[in-house]
Every structure is written in C-alpha cells, then in structure tokens.
UniProtKB/Swiss-Prot annotation:
<dbReference type="InterPro" id="IPR036162">
    <property type="entry name" value="Resolvase-like_N_sf"/>
</dbReference>
<feature type="DNA-binding region" description="Recombinase">
    <location>
        <begin position="152"/>
        <end position="288"/>
    </location>
</feature>
<feature type="coiled-coil region">
    <location>
        <begin position="372"/>
        <end position="448"/>
    </location>
</feature>
<dbReference type="InterPro" id="IPR025827">
    <property type="entry name" value="Zn_ribbon_recom_dom"/>
</dbReference>
<dbReference type="GO" id="GO:0003677">
    <property type="term" value="F:DNA binding"/>
</dbReference>
<feature type="active site" description="O-(5'-phospho-DNA)-serine intermediate">
    <location>
        <position position="9"/>
    </location>
</feature>
<dbReference type="GO" id="GO:0006310">
    <property type="term" value="P:DNA recombination"/>
</dbReference>
<dbReference type="InterPro" id="IPR011109">
    <property type="entry name" value="DNA_bind_recombinase_dom"/>
</dbReference>
<dbReference type="GO" id="GO:0000150">
    <property type="term" value="F:DNA strand exchange activity"/>
</dbReference>
<dbReference type="InterPro" id="IPR050639">
    <property type="entry name" value="SSR_resolvase"/>
</dbReference>
<dbReference type="Pfam" id="PF13408">
    <property type="entry name" value="Zn_ribbon_recom"/>
</dbReference>
<feature type="domain" description="Resolvase/invertase-type recombinase catalytic">
    <location>
        <begin position="1"/>
        <end position="144"/>
    </location>
</feature>
<comment type="function">
    <text>Putative site-specific recombinase having a very important role in sporulation. It probably plays a role in the recombination of SpoIIIC and SpoIVCB to form sigma K factor.</text>
</comment>
<dbReference type="Pfam" id="PF00239">
    <property type="entry name" value="Resolvase"/>
</dbReference>
<dbReference type="GO" id="GO:0015074">
    <property type="term" value="P:DNA integration"/>
</dbReference>
<dbReference type="InterPro" id="IPR006119">
    <property type="entry name" value="Resolv_N"/>
</dbReference>
<keyword id="KW-0233">DNA recombination</keyword>
Length: 500
C-alpha cells in the first residue's frame, strides 16, 4: 500500500491554514491513486522525531504494510538532516522507496546535501558489509575451506564440508587430456587443438554441457594447478569492476600476485610431475610460435567468402616442395562456429586484383567516383538475389518435411529426426532473412560522398608523400585500409570490393 506523510507545525498552520490539505493533494497526484494510507502530523514541530503519525508510519513499515512512502519534501519528515537520514535509512533497509513531490528540492542546497549524505551513508554501509564478508572469506580460505563452487571440471563441490571431491567420470577425461598431451607415443603429443577436436568427435560434453571443446578450454585445463592438488583461491582482484560495469564501461579484473593468492590442498587427479611436464611442453609451444615470423598479408582482416559468409584468413600451403600462401574460409581450430565451405584463393592473385583497383583509384580519382556509383547496385543486388534464392530453398525444404510428417502412416519414420531437420532449416531461414534485411537496409542508404571523398583524399595524400616507387607492403596496407571496407570472393572470377 502507498503511504503519504504530511506535516505542518503550529506556526505554519497560523500562516498557511490549509497547508495539510495542499500537501495531501500534491502527494495523491504524485501517487496516481486515491487509494493511499494517510499519515498526518498537524501542529507538530519538525525538530521532533517522535510524532504520532510518523511513529505509526514507521511501525506499519516494519510490519510490511507499506510499499512506498510519498512526502512533499524532506523537511516535512524533519527539520534536522540527521533525522531525515534515519527515516530514509529505515525505509531503504525494508526496500520501501521514499519519494518527494517537490522536484526542485533536489537542486536546492538542502536537497543536494541530503542526497550527498544519503549516498555517503549507503556507500559506507556497502563498504562495511564488503569488508566483513571479505574478511570472513579470507579466514575460511586460510583454514583450507573452498569458498565458491567454481564448476571445476573433474570435481564436485560439497557445500556442507566446503571441500572439492573427485568426480571420477570427469576425472577420467582430465587424465586422458594430460596423457594425450604428455605421452611421446600419443597422436596428440603437445597438440592442444588436436585434443580438443578429438574430445568433440568422441561426443564428450564440457562441464556446461556443450558438445564442442574449444582449444582454449583444453589449454586452461592443462595449466590449472588444481589438477595436481593445488587449488588457488583469492586469485582475482575485482575492485571497482562492478561500478565500471554499471557505468557501461568494460570491467577490468586483475590477477593478484602469487604471494597474495591462497592455495588450498585438494585431491589430485594427475601426478605433480606430469603436470609440471605439461607446463614445460606448453612453454616450448609458446616459444616456438613466437619464433616463427608470421607472413604479412596485404588484405589481413578484410576478406570474406561470398558463399558461406566466413571470414577468409591467410594460410601457408606447400606444393612441389615450395611454400605459397592463400586466403581460405576453412576454420580448422576446435570450437569454430562455422567450418567454412573450403573456398581458397591465391594470395598473389587476390592481392594483384585488389591493389590494381586501388592503384587506379589513387592515380585517377574519377574512376573511384564511377566505381562508388556502381558498387552498391552491382554488389549488393547480386548478393541479395543469392540470399533470396537460398531462403526460398529452405522454405521449400521445410514444407516438404512438414508434408511428410502429416501424410505419412509409416511407423518406422523417425519423427524426431525430421523435426530436428525442420528446426535447423528454420534457423537457417532466420539467419538468411536477417542478412537479407541487412542488405536491403544498406541499399536504401545513400552513399556518404563526404566520407568517401575523405577516405580517398587520405589515401592519395599518403601515396603522394611516399611515391609509387618507394611503396613497401606496409605502405600498401595503409592505403588499402583507408579505402577498403571488405573484399568478398564469390568465385575465382567474381571479386567484390566494398569501399568506404
């Protein structure tokens, strides 16, 4: 029930006469209903905290009879700031909002002080609660207790005992991972990605029930000292992360220095020697990776497959003993959302084509203007046509399957399997429709000529400052990134360049 509180002193009665009535009217208007509990102290000074109506309000609030309190402004509650804060604190602890009718009050010096003090008290209480909670947790950690269920694969959290017990079914998988990784005779010796793919193919589910094992999950398991019986707690410093998150900023969680972390002994799943050897192998793998000089691709991060929609990344291939490079949409790593259709294009061929077009733009700007005029109508309309055909195919596929279910009398028909296919087709149709809408939106938007002109001008200025004969691969990449938004490969002869 909504409660309204009004007050007028003897002096104010003499001056204003109907002050109580005007306050009640304003509070009811704010509440938006006449169905309210009224608490009125008539002829009582705001200096006093003990008032009949205010006492009844506080008592009813403690009994849970009140859901919200509306008051004209804080000086109706009390003339003293401390008393205002006492009442406000009582209500907030019972999750009862205190609302003031007078909107101008918040901007007055008194109002600013009230809300500042209210905020300060609230922060102080939070800090004290956090301090007590944190202190209690630390003491429990130091006594060897497990504070939080971290859903650690291979273990079960026993809340009553505050311990971790080995979950043998999952522990077998942990041992398998370590054995595969550390055994020289294993087909996956030192291969994190190979183990992740193997677990996925075996149908082993992760702790969260996922069917796909990401290589990073396997790496984290291999690096986790809990599996040799040393469980780290108090590892992360989350100070300020909640506030940052509420403010819409990225929350930063820091890892505390090892000497500040608290290690609790738990049952080991693998021997300490095997865990140490796994760390050595992981370190060797990292050093090996860093020692390899990566090939520099002109169109890194810009290429997309026009068939499956995957991004195309650079890969090294070998033919007749010689290395060469391609752009491919194939994703071989474990956990990839889409494996891709396998389209590849020679890096040299694609680079020549794209750089050839860019060179024309920066040496003959009029060609860029003509290209921009044709770009949207050609590229987007062709892509839209392909997607609309795919949508039509999925619709027909769903219709055929639905007809099959409704007309068939065959008891051997796997209805569940057919329903699963229908769901997959619906998902595909939804994704295609979303892409279709996105393209249609792009086609409706007029070219931003000022943005295009600026992009071209920056590219031309950069090109002229270096000179055609002095351009390095990095210089070409800079120029390409000024102008090119994305390169889409439909087939070996159809390449679309989307520009800014």
């Amino acid at each position: 029930m909504i409660a309204i509180y009004v007050r007028v002193s003897t002096e104010e009665q003499a001056i204003k006469g109907s002050s109580i009535d005007s306050q009640i009217e304003a509070c009811i208007k704010k509440a938006g209903t006449k169905d309210v509990l009224k608490y009125a102290d008539e002829g009582f000074s705001g200096e006093l905290l003990e008032r009949p109506a205010l006492n009844r309000l506080r008592e009813d609030a403690s009994k849970g009879l009140i859901s919200q309190v509306i008051c004209y402004d804080p000086d109706r509650l009390s003339r003293k700031l401390m008393n205002q804060l006492i009442i406000d604190d009582e209500l907030r602890k019972r999750n009862i909002p205190l609302i003031f009718v007078n909107g101008e009050y918040a901007n007055s010096p008194e109002g600013q002080l009230f809300f500042a003090m209210r905020g300060a008290i609230s922060e102080f209480e939070k800090a004290k609660i956090k301090e007590r909670t944190s202190s209690g947790r630390l003491q429990k950690m130091k006594k060897g207790m497990i504070i939080k269920d971290s859903k650690l694969y291979g273990y079960k959290f026993v809340k009553e005992k505050r311990t971790l017990e080995i979950l043998e079914e999952e522990a077998k998988i942990i041992r398998m991972i370590f054995n595969y990784f550390t055994d020289h005779k294993s087909p996956f010796f030192g291969r994190v990605n190979g183990i992740a793919l193997h677990l996925t193919q075996m149908g082993v589910k992760t702790k969260k029930g996922a069917k796909v094992w990401h290589r990073q999950v396997v790496r984290q398991i291999l690096m986790n000292s809990s599996y040799k019986g040393e469980h780290r707690q108090y590892k992360y410093d989350t100070e300020g992360s909640y506030v940052s998150k509420q403010a819409g900023n990225k929350s930063i969680i820091k890892i505390r220095p090892e000497e500040e972390q608290i290690t609790v002994t738990i049952p080991a799943i693998v021997p300490a020697e095997q865990w140490d050897y796994a760390q050595e192998l992981l370190g060797q793998s990292k050093r090996k990776h860093l020692s390899i000089s990566p090939h520099n691709y002109l169109l890194s991060g810009l290429v997309r497959c026009g068939k499956c929609g995957n991004t195309m990344t650079g890969k090294k291939r070998k033919s007749h003993g010689k290395d060469y490079y391609v752009y491919t949409c194939r994703k071989n790593y474990s956990g990839a959302k889409d494996r891709g259709c396998g389209k590849e294009m020679s890096e040299n061929k694609l680079n020549r084509h794209v750089w050839g077009e860019i060179f024309k733009f920066i040496t003959n700007p009029q060609k860029y203007v003509s290209f921009k005029e044709a770009e949207q109508s050609n590229h987007l309309s062709d892509e839209l046509e392909l997607i609309e055909k795919e949508i039509e195919k999925t619709k027909k596929g769903r219709k055929r399957l639905l007809t099959l279910i409704s007309l068939s009398d065959d008891d051997d028909l796997d209805i569940d399997e057919i329903k699963a296919q229908i769901i997959e087709l619906q998902k595909k149709q939804n994704q295609l429709t979303e892409k279709c809408n996105e393209i249609q939106s792009k086609m409706k938007v007029l070219d931003d000529t000022s943005s295009s002109e600026n992009a071209l001008k920056r590219a031309i200025d950069y090109f002229q400052s270096i000179g055609a004969d002095n351009l390095t691969l990095e210089d070409k990449k800079t120029i390409v990134n000024f102008i090119v938004k994305e390169v889409t490969i439909v087939d070996s002869d159809t390449i679309y360049i989307e520009t800014y």
